[in-house]
From Swiss-Prot:
It comes from the Eukaryota. Belongs to the universal ribosomal protein uS7 family. GO terms for cellular component: chloroplast; small ribosomal subunit. Its main location: plastid. Keywords: Chloroplast, Plastid, Ribonucleoprotein, Ribosomal protein, RNA-binding, rRNA-binding. Signal peptide: none annotated. One of its GO terms (molecular function) is structural constituent of ribosome. One of the primary rRNA binding proteins, it binds directly to 16S rRNA where it nucleates assembly of the head domain of the 30S subunit. It holds the Pfam family Ribosomal_S7. The keyword RNA-binding applies. This is Small ribosomal subunit protein uS7cz/uS7cy.
């Protein structure tokens, strides 16, 4: 282990148009093969589609969707005495946001549809309303944590 000290936590930058960190986090997660300009195009088209669908501020829809999908608790596999237990752990806000973004993008990639911008906008609108695959994934994780509450002392 290094004796030089701890690395400071990186802060995410905000995107150029909306000046929003959440949008930039989405861009960085949707990015494939280093094509960041394409990732920005996809996100901005999705935001425009949200604006057209809901006729409200698209960033508030995005925030509401993130709030709905972000988990409070997660399960982690822990090996104890030859058997593996799913141990429920509380997670911080940063890790929760990262999980929520991953689930939203995964759910939107699985959706049938024309292009990624359309699928992402549909998933975000559904998540803001309280439905969709990403919300289902969060509820499933919470159910798993509740079912394995007996193993909480294995942390």
């Amino acid at each position: 282990m290094s004796r030089r000290g701890t690395a400071e936590e990186k802060t995410t930058k905000s995107d150029p148009i909306y000046r929003n960190r959440l949008v930039n986090m989405l861009v960085n997660r949707i990015l494939k093969h280093g094509k960041k300009s394409l990732a920005y195009q996809i996100i901005y088209r999705a935001v425009k589609k949200i604006q057209q669908k809901t006729e409200t501020n698209p960033l508030s829809v995005l925030r509401q969707a993130m709030r709905g999908v972000t988990p409070d608790i997660a399960v982690k596999a822990r090996r104890v005495g030859g058997s593996t237990h799913q141990v429920p752990l509380e997670i911080g806000s940063t890790q929760g946001k990262a999980l929520a973004i991953r689930w939203l993008l995964g759910a939107s990639r699985k959706r049938p549809g024309r292009n990624m911008a359309f699928k992402l906008s549909s998933e975000l609108v559904d998540a803001a309303k309280g439905s969709g695959d990403a919300i289902r994934k969060k509820e499933e994780t919470h159910r798993m944590a509740e079912a394995n509450r007996a193993f909480a002392h294995f942390r």
